[in-house]
């Protein structure tokens, strides 16, 4: 392919945007014999993992939390995030994995599982438990237009007693929600890392497949980038 300085810089910028290298440098060498250019890319790795632990105590009880986050799991750019928070009346836990280039197909895939429980049965007369799983994929469908498709499924159970409010008692029961998620991302930024010009339009919609409330969720965001000072 013909040498293109713009495409080279874009590739270097895409590597930097992965946020798993401390530095990324390029060297372009002219080969007079073959009349080609040799491109050497030098990278320096950086720590990409985080471990979090927390603990708190108060008049209404205590809480403990723990989390592990890794942006370059097994050296393949896979993002892993796992955390939980436990208190005297609640539990929140989540585990998610994202592979940005599944089997070198330029498609990202993700899966996430989470659980939330709130136990106020003795104090306010209600208890809720919600668990679910989400999975999907993202890929470039057309030039600079990225399409995301996913599915989320959640099961929720609500228990109440006579001390709960009338509204809470009316909500008692089991619920199953299943949604199809579609994302449309039109990305015309000049570069992903330290963007200085261009725009990005993002639209997301969650369509109910099975839902007691038949809630449809929409989200739209448009960002425009420019330099304040030259």
Language model regions located:
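Gram-negative/organellar outer-membrane beta-barrel architecture
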Residues: 2-202, 215, 225-227
């Amino acid at each position: 392919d013909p040498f293109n300085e713009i495409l080279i810089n874009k590739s270097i910028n895409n590597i930097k945007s992965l946020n798993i290298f401390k530095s990324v440098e390029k060297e372009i060498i002219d080969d007079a014999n073959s009349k080609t250019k040799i491109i050497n890319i030098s990278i320096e790795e950086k720590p990409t993992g985080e471990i979090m632990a927390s603990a708190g105590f108060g008049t209404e009880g205590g809480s403990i939390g723990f989390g592990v986050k890794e942006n370059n799991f097994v050296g393949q750019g896979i993002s892993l995030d796992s955390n939980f928070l436990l208190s005297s009346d609640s539990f929140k836990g989540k585990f998610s994995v994202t592979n940005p280039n599944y089997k070198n197909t330029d498609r990202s895939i993700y899966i996430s599982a989470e659980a939330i429980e709130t136990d106020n049965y003795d104090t306010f007369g209600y208890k809720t438990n919600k668990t679910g799983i989400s999975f999907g994929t993202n890929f470039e469908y057309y030039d600079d237009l990225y399409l995301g498709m996913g599915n989320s499924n959640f099961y929720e159970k609500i228990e109440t007693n006579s001390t709960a409010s009338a509204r809470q008692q009316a909500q008692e029961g089991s619920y199953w929600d299943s949604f199809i998620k579609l994302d449309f991302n039109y990305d015309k930024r000049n570069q992903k890392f330290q963007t200085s010009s261009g725009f990005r339009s993002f639209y997301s919609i969650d369509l109910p497949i099975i839902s007691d409330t038949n809630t449809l969720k929409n989200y739209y965001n448009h960002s425009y980038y420019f330099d304040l000072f030259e």
